[in-house]
Amino acid sequence: MGKAKFERNKPHVNIGTIGHVDHGKTTLTAAITITLAKTGGATAKNYADIDAAPEEKARGITINTAHVEYETPARHYAHVDCPGHADYVKNMITGAAQMDGAILVCSAADGPMPQTREHILLARQVGVPALVVFLNKVDMVDDEELLELVEMEVRELLSSYNFPGDDIPIIKGSALAAVEDRNPEIGQDRILELMKAVDEYIPTPERPLDKPFLMPVEDVFSISGRGTVVTGRVEQGIVKVGEEIEIVGIRPTVKTTCTGVEMFRKLLDQGQAGDNIGALLRGVDREGVERGQVLCKPGSITPHTLFEAEAYILTKEEGGRHTPFFTNYRPQFYFRTTDVTGIVKLPEDKEMVLPGDNVKMDVELINPIAMDKGLRFAIREGGRTVGAGVVSEIKK
């Protein structure tokens, strides 16, 4: 399917519902589809359809995720909802379901709970750019002052994790009322208000095509009389023949020129996001570039060895470790196309990490890797995946 374009006249945005168990994430997801179905913007789905989330694998980890899609007059959305807390943790850390924004669901009757906190923290750590809040189950709270108190608490919580708590839209309503098509003043009217807030407040993501050129190196060939060809899938941006590019990671950064782009044995004048290409590099010998490096627009990404990460460690049942690990644990970190050994340093208050935990940790790699905040990786021991992580901060 080389160049088939996905025809769509509206901007596409990936979102999801997050929040504490039983606060109404799945009911809200159903409510959105049922409400938007009235104007032809969705196929109505009930709670049971969404709750029976199929299993999928991402970076060797099994995750249950339900996907629904719908549209507003302004945008097309792909929406993810997970049945269990562990699925959320895994989903957000592996980036299995990319989130350009999220709807934080919080029960007005209970206020913020432990997983409300944890999901906000995860959203911050994995780089979810914006949140909108749905304060659910308002029909279970008779006291207007109590409602205001919960709203204040949610705003303070968001601010404490460096989200703009004072500015984030908070919509109050009842997802169940919308699903049952009653009390529109707290039901479907509020769902429409929520979607308007999502349309306006969650920024349209930059398309991969508009980002600076980046291609992870998968293979390197030498073609006699022509030079060195590097193959891989262009992750983002465009590379044009004749442009200067950099080779970054593992060894010192090298500048070169792309003198040719091949795809399916045809010569092209450029390669773009999504293309599997061979890039011909000027003046680079076969030994000068290796799998695990990236080709990129000069200056757009830099190599690093020390970073903070948020990681999820697989349980024994998921095929992970059977025992905990401690500071100075030395697994391999699989970035894009290659493994690099790294040393783990745990936070002061964390003596050990048990299988099934998610944890913040510092990692020092023995070789530098081209990285940005938000880069995903797998944690492996002898080729077996034992965890997944995301770069939350670059330190060196």
From Swiss-Prot:
| Stretches for region G1 | 19-26
Report what the protein is called.
Elongation factor Tu 2
PROSITE patterns cross-referenced by the UniProt entry: G_TR_1, G_TR_2
UniProt xrefs under Pfam families = GTP_EFTU, GTP_EFTU_D2, GTP_EFTU_D3
- Name the segments for region: G5: 174-176
Residue ranges constituting the tr-type G domain according to the UniProt record: 10-206
Q: Where does Mg(2+) bind?
A: 26
Protein location? Cytoplasm
Which parts of this chain are annotated as the region G3?
81-84
Organism superkingdom? Bacteria
Identify the HAMAP family for this entry: EF_Tu_B
In its UniProt entry, the species of origin is given as Hyphomonas neptunium (strain ATCC 15444)
**Which NCBIfam families does UniProt cross-reference here?**
EF-Tu, PRK00049.1, PRK12735.1, PRK12736.1, small_GTP
InterPro entries according to UniProt: EF-Tu_GTP-bd, EF-Tu_GTPase, EFTu-like_2, EFTU_2, G_TR_CS, P-loop_NTPase, Small_GTP-bd, T_Tr_GTP-bd_dom
What family is this?
Belongs to the TRAFAC class translation factor GTPase superfamily. Classic translation factor GTPase family. EF-Tu/EF-1A subfamily.
The encoding gene: tuf2
Write one Gene Ontology MF term: guanosine tetraphosphate binding
Task: Indicate the quaternary assembly.
Answer: Monomer.
Where mainly located? cytoplasm
Q: Which UniProt keywords apply?
A: Cytoplasm, Elongation factor, GTP-binding, Hydrolase, Magnesium, Metal-binding, Nucleotide-binding, Protein biosynthesis
- Name the Enzyme Commission number(s) assigned to this protein: 3.6.5.3
Residues holding GTP: 19-26, 81-85, 136-139
CDD domains documented for this protein: EF_Tu (cd01884), EFTU_II (cd03697), EFTU_III (cd03707)
User: What are the boundaries of the region G2?
Assistant: 60-64
